[in-house]
Regions:
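Active-site loop of short-chain dehydrogenase/reductase
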Residues: 11-15, 65-67, 109-110, 151-155
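Residue(s) in the substrate-gating loop at a strand-loop-helix junction
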Residues: 20
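Short aromatic-enriched loop/helix-cap "lid" or pocket-rim segments at secondary-structure transitions
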Residues: 28-30, 80-85, 125-126, 170
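Conserved active-site region of classical short-chain dehydrogenase/reductase
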Residues: 1-5, 54, 133-136, 140
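Feature marks short, surface-exposed loop/turn motifs that line or immediately flank catalytic pockets
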Residues: 24, 77, 163-165
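C-terminal substrate-binding subdomain of Rossmann-fold SDR/epimerase-dehydratase oxidoreductases
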Residues: 96-237
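Catalytic helix-loop patch of NAD(P)-dependent Rossmann-fold dehydrogenases
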Residues: 1-2, 9, 13-14, 23-75, ...
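Oxidoreductase cofactor-interface core, primarily capturing Rossmann-like NAD(P)-dependent enzymes
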Residues: 71, 82, 110-113
Length: 237
């Protein structure tokens, strides 16, 4: 609300909103497209994104000069390939890959895999992982596209690789790519976790001209390089 108010005061008409695939909750069909119901969030985080999107849609209806793009991220991972910029969670990571890298680096005793009885190939949750560099490029493409469109405008786009990988598959691939061992234990399900979700990214590809240029292997490799850079930096202090 504050951002929308300041935009109005300052005459800013273009908005790119960082939304999330969590607005879909547990989809009934996969891959999930932007046409799927977007009000079924199963977590508090997802619900905040649903509310945020609704506020923006209401603002566009009320202000016909406003243009907005809602980018629904799936699971961004990785870091800059040079290891200078990356994810630095405060406290215990809530996402899988930072927990993997911190465990491999010896900062955490073990990785807990939450749930092994989901209706997936190996019983663990399936997600759509994409490199953070691809997320960054999508923002640039969204801004350029939005500038060319008439107002009012409010369009949602999925940002995902278009394929799902299970938690076990990601851990195994990380170990293969980096040569690092990740101690792991089995734990109970986490409240709010959906079994599986991955994107139909057709709209992003056809409308924005966006594609995932980085695969899961490179994203995991860059995430590990970032973790190693953090370790080296802390050793010099």
């Amino acid at each position: 609300v504050n951002v929308l108010q300041v935009m109005q005061w300052r005459g800013v008409q273009d908005l790119v909103f960082s939304s999330s695939c969590t607005v879909y909750g547990q989809p009934t069909h996969m891959p999930v497209s932007e046409r799927a119901p977007d009000h079924s969030a199963s977590s508090p985080y997802g619900y905040t994104k649903v509310v945020g999107e609704r506020m923006i849609r209401d603002a566009v209806r009320a202000n016909h000069t406003l243009k907005a793009v809602l980018l629904r991220y799936f699971n961004p991972i990785g870091a800059h390939p040079e290891g200078h910029i990356g994810e630095l969670p405060i406290g215990v990571p809530g996402n899988l890959v930072p927990f993997i890298t911190q465990t491999a680096a010896g900062l955490r005793k073990q990785l807990t895999i939450h749930g092994n009885d989901y209706a997936t190939t190996d019983g663990t949750c399936v997600r759509d992982y994409l490199h953070v560099l691809d997320v960054a490029s999508a923002h640039v493409m969204a801004l350029r596209w939005m500038k060319e469109q008439p107002s009012p405008l409010c369009e949602a786009f999925n940002l995902g690789a278009g394929e799902g990988h299970s938690v076990k598959q990601v851990v195994d691939l990380f170990e293969e790519v980096t040569g690092q061992h990740v101690p792991k234990v089995q734990g109970p399900r986490r409240a709010g976790d959906v079994a599986a979700i991955w994107a139909d990214n057709t709209k992003s590809r056809e409308v924005l001209g966006w594609n995932c240029e980085h695969d899961l292997r490179s994203a995991l490799r860059d995430a590990w390089n970032w973790q190693c850079s953090l370790k080296e930096a802390s050793a010099h202090h």
